[in-house]
Amino acid sequence: LVPRSEAPNVISGKWVVKIKKNSDGSIERYKARWCARGFSQKQDIDYSEVFAPVIRYSSVRLLLAYANLHSLKPFGADVSNAFARADCTDNLFVEQPHGYTTFDSAGNPFVCKLNKGLYGTKQAGRDWHRALRAKLLLAGWVQHESDPSIYSLDGPSGRQFLGIYVDDIIHLCSSLSVHDTFVSFCNSNFPTTSQGELSFILGMK
């Protein structure tokens, strides 16, 4: 928390509540998240570059066809609060979450200076992809030029592929044990949950 006077622009925020459902429509959990209102950001003050790639649907279909041809299995992994795992590359100031406001001695509310990404900011997706990409490349994964959200790795366990859609990861590999090893790698960097073998991928069954 910092005094409001230190912030060239204060980004407003809001609580976003959501019901996350499983592929069969049943409720998995209820979520509440404090998000920035990105429309209140000012260009060249709060952000400059904002583009972040996500895997194309045509690439997903191509990966699944390749998996079927080479007997690979599609597994899923989900990174918990992904945007908050990446360092914030800009100086961003956001108002405090409503209901949890702290004031200075003069009665003025402090503002939050972000150290990590926050959902709703324009560059959060870019910062997250940059952080994930750095970890994957360091581990030997190769980013594909045709679709920068696809990565591959050749090793003793055979060829593996990743398809990245924000915080959802499609992992093609030969067995559950290989997938578990990948999830362990992810957990050493970001809290990650395995979704097991997939039958429902980005709206496609």
Model-derived features: positions:
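Long, low-complexity, charge-biased intrinsically disordered regions
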Residues: 1-205
